[in-house]
Structure formats: C-alpha cells, structure tokens
C-alpha cells in the first residue's frame, strides 16, 4: 500500500467525524471556508507546516499556537478539531484530512470537483459554459472548478474529474500523433 493510501485510510475517520460535527452544527459552509483558509495558510508558510509536523515540539506549544492563530478567525469547531488532532498526534495529516473532508462534503452536496488545466485564464463566460457542460456530463448539482494555468498546453484544455481525463489540448494531440508516428516507424 502506498504511503498516500495509508494516510488516506487514517485521515478518513477524522474527516467523516468533522463532516458529521459540522453538519450537526449546521456549519458546513463555514467549516469549508475555514479549512480552505487553514490549508492556504499552511501552503504559504512552510515554517508553520514544519512546526506542526515536528514531533519534538510539545502538544502544549502546538495547542497554544493554534489558539493564538485561529481564535476569532475560524469556527470554534475547527479549533477544537485541530486540538484533537494535536492531542492524537495526527496534525501532520491535516492536509490529507482537509482534502478528504472536502471530498465528503462535495459528495454530500452533489458537487463535482473538476480540475481544469488551460494555457490561458478562462473568462467568466467560458467558465460558466464549462460548468454547465460538466453538470450535464456528471448529473451533479454544482461544479467546483480548480483552474491551473499550464502554458505548455498551447491551446485547448485538460479536464480531470475523479479518475477521468478529457484532453482537448494541442499539446495532447501532438503527443498522441508523435506516439502514433513512433509506433508506425
């Protein structure tokens, strides 16, 4: 089993518990925003990430930092959840837990996450059209686009929804032609 699969197995019960707690408190949207904020902060601050993941730093110090950083910034449920993760020495799995949490919430809300790779930024009209097309394809209520700019695609785009990939990029077409020509010769 890969380490990512192992971490996902450990993270899933925590994510499920958080979804249940957030749902009971009627705070799913607020918790989503708060976890996105925390994830963004951790991605921007390597020092903070290293601090939380360091097993040599005591749980008390980590708890104090969480309290000072996030009190009055995020929902109290999120703070309590972070403190539980620190107590159980699972704070190093926070990224995976947040990812699993969002997956579960999006499933609950019939939301599909579509990763879109494009060479240029899509306009609002293009994004709306893409969202509508993905809604039709997946029969979902809502679609969340995660757009990444990849200039090497030249033109077109790549859409990843779960394990499915739709590649309409010029780069993908050229790669396909190259593979065909290499196979023929």
From Swiss-Prot:
Keywords: ATP synthesis, CF(1), Chloroplast, Hydrogen ion transport, Ion transport, Membrane, Plastid, Thylakoid, Transport. GO terms for molecular function: proton-transporting ATP synthase activity, rotational mechanism. InterPro entries: ATP_synth_OSCP/delta_N_sf, ATPase_OSCP/d_CS, ATPase_OSCP/dsu. It comes from the Eukaryota. The keyword Ligase does not apply. One of its GO terms (cellular component) is proton-transporting ATP synthase complex. Transmembrane segments: none annotated. It is found in: Plastid, Chloroplast thylakoid membrane. It is a peripheral membrane protein. It holds the Pfam family OSCP. Its main location: plastid. The keyword Thylakoid applies. PANTHER family: ATP SYNTHASE DELTA CHAIN. F-type ATPases have 2 components, F(1) - the catalytic core - and F(0) - the membrane proton channel. F(1) has five subunits: alpha(3), beta(3), gamma(1), delta(1), epsilon(1). CF(0) has four main subunits: a(1), b(1), b'(1) and c(10-14). The alpha and beta chains form an alternating ring which encloses part of the gamma chain. F(1) is attached to F(0) by a central stalk formed by the gamma and epsilon chains, while a peripheral stalk is formed by the delta, b and b' chains. F(1)F(0) ATP synthase produces ATP from ADP in the presence of a proton or sodium gradient. F-type ATPases consist of two structural domains, F(1) containing the extramembraneous catalytic core and F(0) containing the membrane proton channel, linked together by a central stalk and a peripheral stalk. During catalysis, ATP synthesis in the catalytic domain of F(1) is coupled via a rotary mechanism of the central stalk subunits to proton translocation. NCBIfam families: ATP_synt_delta. Belongs to the ATPase delta chain family. This is ATP synthase subunit delta, chloroplastic.
